[in-house]
From Swiss-Prot:
One Pfam family it belongs to: Ribosomal_L34
Annotated Basic residues bias: 1-23, 30-44
Biological processes, Gene Ontology terms: translation
Keywords: Ribonucleoprotein, Ribosomal protein
Family as reported in the entry's similarity comment: Belongs to the bacterial ribosomal protein bL34 family.
Top-level division of the source organism's lineage: Bacteria
Single GO MF descriptor: structural constituent of ribosome
Name of the gene encoding the protein in the UniProt record: rpmH
InterPro entries for the chain: Ribosomal_bL34
Region (Disordered): 1-44
The name this protein goes by in its record: Large ribosomal subunit protein bL34
Species per Swiss-Prot/TrEMBL record: Caldanaerobacter subterraneus subsp. tengcongensis (strain DSM 15242 / JCM 11007 / NBRC 100824 / MB4) (Thermoanaerobacter tengcongensis)
Length: 44
């Protein structure tokens, strides 16, 4: 079986990071929802 998840720190940050979230309206909404929900970790 192939291992499909090959983690890379850079890719994870580039795709799911805080700055990426802040760069779009939808991303800011994601952060807002996670803050309202009380998440300790907002982004990857």
């Amino acid at each position: 079986m192939l291992r499909t998840y090959q983690p890379k720190k850079r890719h994870r940050k580039k795709v799911h990071g805080f700055r990426k979230r802040m760069s779009t309206k939808a991303g800011r909404n994601v952060l807002k929802r996670r803050r309202l929900k009380g998440r300790h970790r907002l982004t990857a």
